[in-house]
Regions:
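Extended, histidine- and acidic-residue-enriched regions that form the cofactor-binding/catalytic faces
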Residues: 111, 132, 137, 141-142
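Active-site-adjacent alpha-helix immediately C-terminal to a catalytic or transition-state-stabilizing loop
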Residues: 55, 63-64, 69, 146-175
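Residue-level signal for short, function-critical loop segments
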Residues: 3, 78, 174
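Short helix/loop segment immediately N-terminal to the Walker
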Residues: 120-124, 137, 162-167
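Loop-to-helix element that buttresses phosphate recognition and phosphoryl-transfer chemistry
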Residues: 4-60, 64, 138-154
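Phosphate-coordination/substrate-recognition cap region in phosphate-metabolizing enzymes
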Residues: 30-125, 131, 158
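Beta-strand elements within well-structured catalytic alpha/beta cores of enzymes
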Residues: 1, 47, 73, 167-172
Length: 175
């Protein structure tokens, strides 16, 4: 999982919004790199989501282990779960507004996504330039855990599984 982000610090639902690592997150990434370095592994494959917090986590790890790969694969399918209309909102405030049970249901139930994010929101992935190369019909407005699982596992099976005989780093999210 990527290091702590700025919105993790603010206790906000992040989803597909591109937020930076917090100072603590940068430290966590470097510590992960130190751990990997001690293992003295030859890592052949590198994957990350499209999101800056995962990309920067991977870069900090690679800098720490002194590896400069030319084969980093960025895959939007490895992105965090899309939290729909909860995106950008503070978790504690939403618990007060909707009730703890309702927020828990959106966060942890298997197939119950939050309400879709309004297409006009600046947080909607269709309005964020890093997603311009993704076909519009593939960009979600919200996701359940099941939707996220299917997206990530499908990508893993089709693209990563064939490389499991090698050492791999995947810098992604804790869905």
């Amino acid at each position: 999982r990527h290091g702590q982000s700025e919105w993790n610090l603010e206790n906000k639902f992040t989803g597909w919004v591109d937020v930076e690592l917090a100072p603590q997150g940068k430290l966590e990434a470097c510590k992960a790199g130190e751990f990997i370095k001690k293992l003295n592994l030859e890592i052949k494959h590198f994957y990350t989501s499209y999101q800056l917090r995962s990309i920067d986590t991977l870069k900090l790890i690679l800098n720490t282990i002194r590896v400069k790969p030319n084969n980093i694969i960025k895959a939007w399918q490895l992105n965090e779960r899309h939290y729909g209309s909860l995106t950008g909102l503070k978790k504690d405030e939403m618990k007060k507004k909707l009730g703890e049970d309702e927020v828990h249901k959106f966060r942890r139930s298997w197939d119950n996504p939050p309400k879709p994010l309004n297409i006009n929101s600046p947080y909607h992935p269709k309005n964020i330039s890093i997603y311009n190369d993704i076909p519009r019909n593939l960009i979600p407005d919200t996701e359940s855990l099941k939707d996220t699982y299917e997206r990530v596992v499908s990508y893993f099976v089709e693209n990563i599984e064939k490389n499991l005989q090698d050492n791999i780093i995947i810098s992604a999210h804790g869905n």
